[in-house]
Amino acid sequence: MRIERDLHMATGDGETSYTKNSRIQEKTMFQIKPVLEEATRAVYTALHPQTMVVADLGCSSGPNTLRFVSEVIGIIARHCKEYGRQHDHTQLQFFLNDLPGNDFNNLFQLIQQFNKSTAINHKSEAAEALPPPCYISGLPGSYYTRIFPSESVHLFHSLFCLQWRSEAPEGNKKTCLDIYITKTMSPSMVKLFQQQFQKDFSLFLRLRYEELVSGGQMVLTFIGRKHENVFTGESNHLYGLLAQSLKSLVDEGLVEKEKLESFYLPMYSPSVGEVEAILKQVGLFNMNHVKVFQTNWDPYDDLESDVVHNSIRSGENVAKCLRAVMQPLVASQFGEPILDKLFKEYARRVAKHLENEKTKHAIIVLSIEKAIHL
């Protein structure tokens, strides 16, 4: 498994694609709109850039990417109208960044359609709040490296990306077949997951500090956990069920045990406390906002109740969403022929889990500003 090659969402627009199975990301985008608006307005008001540079890190492909672009355009248009600045002649430059395996071809086709319709849409939504000119470019590369010149970006955004690590921890599983943190995992292995997060997030902050202009901000949204106890995270259940599904294929002789023994997910879902500790240690950013909110595993279940009314359907929905995210990674390790059977088994196990416990994702949204050091 090579992270830069294999870590990307399922491509295309078929039934198992990320484009068709990214409703959780869409719902989360709606939840964080007030945070994004506050940060965007603050940067624009403080800096009044002639060209405002905005970067979406880990953009993937599909409509959610352009929802973010559209949202920022709308925020600037409304702000200019409210404060009589329609003639500021501000331009927006968007950079959409992801690893090279991302479906940039699909994304560029969507951008072409978006460019044709954006002026009409914003004119109808905001009367005289005409959108500023915008320019959109793709930018392949890892956000765990430098990807922009020094002090060139005004606003960074990232949605559902910073739970991904730059590499998976390496270790001998010996007696267990876990792929993510569980209570049966050795303390030394758990520590490797935590250390990789600390290393990656610290590096990410230092890199972005160099690339942000003075007064620039970041809005970062990623899967975390509600509690400090590393064994009680919601992700533990989600990926534990995937590990069980893979083990069932080992028992059937469809997956080699050695391949599962050597497979760890390059992920870590931190607590707010862990995030704040690294921010304090790095010391390069001021925190404007931090919040944890929850959303149901099943992206089509919008009910607040503690009961899943159709566990079979919810299991299938959860499996489709996870497959859209995990398919390339799983296929690189175990081969494509097992995918249908694996995620069918996973849907069954998720349904059984949801019969007993309605589980939610814990999502952290963080707004931070580049600190000024005199």
Curated annotation (Swiss-Prot):
Annotated positions binding Mg(2+): 261, 263
Pfam families assigned to the protein according to its UniProt record, in alphabetical order: Methyltransf_7
Enzyme Commission numbers on file: 2.1.1.277
Molecular function per GO: S-adenosylmethionine-dependent methyltransferase activity
PANTHER family to which the protein is assigned, alphabetical: S-ADENOSYL-L-METHIONINE:CARBOXYL METHYLTRANSFERASE FAMILY PROTEIN
Functional note: Methyltransferase involved in the biosynthesis of methyl anthranilate in response to stresses. Utilizes anthranilic acid as substrate. Produces exclusively the O-methyl ester.
Protein name per its UniProtKB record: Anthranilate O-methyltransferase 2
Taxonomic placement: Eukaryota, Viridiplantae, Streptophyta, Embryophyta, Tracheophyta
This protein's encoding gene: AAMT2
